[in-house]
């Protein structure tokens, strides 16, 4: 049998796909999921050998790759070798339809079924496929295997991409398992660019074995880091939070199985990177009527288009400014003005721009500054500021301007501009951008503008609708503290006059980041509960002197009053029988040989 390799190299940034994906393959068998993940790992070893960072396995791209492999077999009965699917879509069109919103389009295929090592060997032996596999611009990968149950026809698809808003973390080159808790992490830096929604390069990071970052401290960013997993056996997840010079954060994670033999029935796309269209916030202050949210949208004097328009002005070092620098406009020679602009931001969505300004003299009742926004040809402002509008000198203060960036082919710019118009120095730290106010509730699920949430930090600002607003804080994205107990019920079966049945256990799980205490109690003299480990309660029954019959009791696990899900009541049923009869079911082996 002949196997053909094909490739396509193109880059395309997803936005608002309109095509449909059609029918799709059946659920992926565990052995094929294993092959997909192993192919990703072996490809990363090839990248390592050529000095290229590893790729993070991605769920939406894998779904796209699986669909195309299935389509190329089941909907092409005469065989097929190419990149155009039966709905007329190329990879750059197909991959976004499955939810991936980064750059995509590069694709490797095998027009036949190959095992992981053979597939990587074949691709590395072909110059074009090798170039795709070793492309340093790719950060994520989708891998799709398909093979017919009858006939054996198969197809392999490998899709590549990178999303500017997502800096992946990869454990041990995306290996499925490790027997050694000491692992190597590759932590991607954030891509700069992306307009006013972009991030700066990572300055610091923290690493933890739990999503709460318990005990973690900020440390200088490094792409490669040694790390130790918690001991024992099972799946382990490592979380990495990075932040740039102005404090914009993002969180990424990866998982690996710690142990000798990975359970293939536990493999799946839940282990891959993904994205969502919304994010849920917890612990919001419901004492305010409204809240504004921002996915770290901030622009300052370090942005590439920031510049002095006219008059006296320069960048200055400022220890209290975000990022350590600001832009000062000075008196002399008339007014002075500076601006910053972009063509990349979310359109037709109401926002509020907060200009973070300070002056060195606030005594004037006349105008000392003006601020202005222009979005797609529509002017907002200018807002005139008097010296007395500043509550103190040399202290930054936020001034809001509501705006919408309209879609306008004749004017594609979003512009923030500020003037010095008086005798005081006017210094701009930067401009925060928040979505328009919405009612406060907690938890609150926020559909993000652009619909592509990938772990970025969320800023919160509360407002009262009368011009007052709170300081900015970072939202809590971890679920509120909750008490969870399993199993939900216990049943004991005993024989009168015989020893009591074996003990059973309850597992207590604390969700959320704030530790809490809990206790256990019961309401029956024949029931005994004992805390044997930090999260396990051992339950015994004592049937001494008990008559034949059915007995009911209740175990109560209760945490502090503010913990959700508490108390938890676990019903216990004890059945004492005169005699317990054990039966054994027959096992029949049938030989179907002719």
Show the residue positions of the predicted features.
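Extracellular carbohydrate-recognition regions
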Residues: 36, 285-288, 292-319, 583-588
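Feature for long, exposed domains in two main contexts
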Residues: 479-582, 591
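Short beta-strand-plus-loop segments that form exposed binding edges in beta-rich domains
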Residues: 415-423
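Functional surface patches built around histidine and acidic residues
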Residues: 18-188, 197
